[in-house]
Amino acid sequence: MRRSHARSRVKNSSSSKSDMDPIKFQIRSGNRAPSSSSTYTLTKPNSKHAKSNLLLTVGSISVVLGVLFLCYSILFSGGNLRGSLRYSVVIDGGSTGTRIHVFGYRIESGKPVFEFRGANYASLKLHPGLSAFADDPDGASVSLTELVEFAKGRVPKGMWIETEVRLMATAGMRLLELPVQEKILGVARRVLKSSGFLFRDEWASVISGSDEGVYAWVVANFALGSLGGDPLKTTGIVELGGASAQVTFVSSEPMPPEFSRTISFGNVTYNLYSHSFLHFGQNAAHDKLWGSLLSRDHNSAVEPTREKIFTDPCAPKGYNLDANTQKHLSGLLAEESRLSDSFQAGGNYSQCRSAALTILQDGNEKCSYQHCSIGSTFTPKLRGRFLATENFFYTSKFFGLGEKAWLSNMISAGERFCGEDWSKLRVKDPSLHEEDLLRYCFSSAYIVSLLHDTLGIPLDDERIGYANQAGDIPLDWALGAFIQQTATETSQHAASGNLHWFHALFSNHPKTLHYLIGIPILMTVLVYLVTKWRKPQLKTIYDLEKGRYIVTRIR
């Protein structure tokens, strides 16, 4: 009985094993031998297949949506590629004031389109210039902050982060020592970094006088429609600022490399002579005259007598030094207490012109080139047409001269003004500050001495025109800097070929790239979580009565 029973048990065990083995095999390799008795083996492969199809479908949809979003960005919302308005900000750190320029422009057919009027251009100037804060660099932050707020009011807030702001300081800052320059620039960088605009430290700098002249030439020829055309049909620029004068024009004459600049627009290359004559601006030259007068080194401007009476030929007769003028001259004065008693206004235009010429020729004996017109600096012969800007224009306008007035007209106007009694001049122009009114005698003489006596422009030559704008475009070097910078960047992008649109879109709109990558990833994650949530939780148990495994769903 025991043996029989034992055999029976073994037989039953063998029978059970026979029943169980297929099920075990199906669990391990359900793809090879599916069984209708096992829910697990029937549903598992179909679940995997369905899940893969679902993920593939959702992934494809995500990619399609991303591509559609990209196309939409390029054609519509990424309008920088299709002509929507961009902005740029340039701050001109001049010698007498700081001016901010806010530009709006478009890119059409891969080229920048500029319109310096209406909503596309705004500017604001505050006094004094940055160089006035040499003893208090932190004081520069007040005016710079006000200028930045002005710009932020002209640029939509959503575009601040992609709007470049640059500060370019000129002659006033160039006169300062480098450590002082850096302190003021450090304050400027701190203000611009916190402005909300796109800014880098190197975008706040003191530019060279040569750069300033080139930028002025660029905006002048852009305004006249000659930029990008025949070099021989371009117009030269002569600027008379407060601290410096700039001369820039196309020249075929061989010149030392330090005076030569080469720039390109489109397929045209221009070889320019460009130089800034520091200390030869109108205000700086007038101060030189005063310095020579006070030091008694300038015989034509100073006529000392035994009573030490100093005569200024460029001051209209009847003029007496006021407190402000004495304060301005305090740095040059050796005997301040006696200045008021020893000063005499000469009111002599001819002597004033001679004094101005002496200032312009100062240093000629040190010339190391074949020809030097101003000081010891090489200057080629002027050719073509010229625009005389800034103080050339202001002086011409003050005397009521037209844009094409001859230099002989300037002489006549200067002679009348210098010879007039000061009291009568004050009555004619009561709104002008006394110091500004005083300078017009010297200015008229200095202009003739610079353009005719020094640069050789005939007195009746019509090649020269006095203007501060051409059409409705201001002839401001800052506009030229903006034009050249934008044109250069655009041409560089165009040179990169098919990647231009990609760079333009994603460099200016980084959020577009984030969306393009993020949307498909987000959708894929969401689908994964949903399928994970909807995936049935299965539990496998062994049924002793039926002698098989049973797979059940857990809720």
From Swiss-Prot:
UniProt cross-references to CDD domains, sorted A to Z: ASKHA_NBD_AtAPY3-like (cd24042)
Disordered: annotated span: 1-45
Domain of life of the native organism: Eukaryota
Spans traversing the lipid bilayer: 56-76, 513-533
GO molecular function: apyrase activity; ATP binding
UniProt topological domain (Extracellular) ranges: 77-512
Membrane topology: Multi-pass membrane protein
Endpoints of the signal sequence: none
Subcellular localization(s) per the UniProt record: Cytoplasmic vesicle membrane
Cofactor: Ca(2+)
InterPro entries noted in UniProt: GDA1_CD39_NTPase (IPR000407)
Compositional bias of kind Basic residues: 1-10
Catalytic reactions of this protein: a ribonucleoside 5'-triphosphate + 2 H2O = a ribonucleoside 5'-phosphate + 2 phosphate + 2 H(+)
Active-site residues per Swiss-Prot or TrEMBL entry: 212 (proton acceptor)
PANTHER family registered for this protein in UniProt: ADENOSINE/GUANOSINE DIPHOSPHATASE, APYRASE 6-RELATED
Function per UniProt: Catalyzes the hydrolysis of phosphoanhydride bonds of nucleoside tri- and di-phosphates. Involved in the regulation of pollen and anther development.
Protein name: Probable apyrase 6
